[in-house]
């Protein structure tokens, strides 16, 4: 099977803790921010919420350094001048990130396509929203732990509707309630759901997993959904139709997700609803909000 490289784009504030310099930018403006970054460019930045994920992603390449499975690229609203501190920190931590786009205050989302990225992680919700609208997987890292889980395996958990799948079924739930949703999913059980914004990212992870024996895979995935039976059948048949393996599937029928994400040992969890992200961060799980689909449209109107 031909190897397909997974490309993940990440912003500087998602990779490193830039709270101090960002506070200066907010309170004193761009010029003060630039001076601060240059004056402190030899000071190594502390890890941000996406740091441990990046380190685990890049560690997958250790088994095949001449033909890496994963590339991480930096996309930042810093200038190249102020970005020197970021690259100094990348070098310090030996992250192996060699490609970057510095946009001097402009949204970098247009470079996601140029880099061929399967995923964009940022702390800037506007950049994430624009990336999703352009048809690429993107999420806003909210909070969590900057340190890795105890497992050397990278463990990624996904919500289903509006993340892996379209929000088609979620719209019925939001507009007509649970009984109508359950009846629709029972009726449509054998019809695969359309793909959501994270389908291609999951497929890229699956492609890497297929390069390894199952017991040696450096990646483990989980679907953690509020769906319960009988709405589970359509999900199972959808993944089967896509020919994508997901290692664990948790159908929680409305239970809070946090404890289950902790039990899975998730390094990151992607969900379109902030309350589920909050449930994850309550368990010190890094959560990334996907501002996509009917639930977020509803939030914008209120």
Which residues make up each language-model segment?
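Asp-based, Mg2+/Mn2+-dependent phosphohydrolase catalytic module
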Residues: 1-8, 125-156, 160-187, 199-200, ...
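Short, well-ordered coil↔helix boundary/capping segments
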Residues: 229, 251, 255, 264-267
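Alpha-helical substrate-recognition element adjacent to the catalytic core
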Residues: 1-106, 150, 159-251
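Glycine-centered loop/turn motif at secondary-structure junctions
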Residues: 61, 94, 116, 135-137, ...
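Short beta-strand/turn micro-motifs composed of small residues
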Residues: 12, 76, 121-122, 225, ...
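Active-site phosphate-binding/coordination module
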Residues: 90-113, 118-125, 139, 243, ...
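Short alpha-helical
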Residues: 80-81, 106-107, 126, 229-230, ...
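Short amphipathic alpha-helical segments and helix-helix/interface helices
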Residues: 54, 87, 108-112, 128, ...
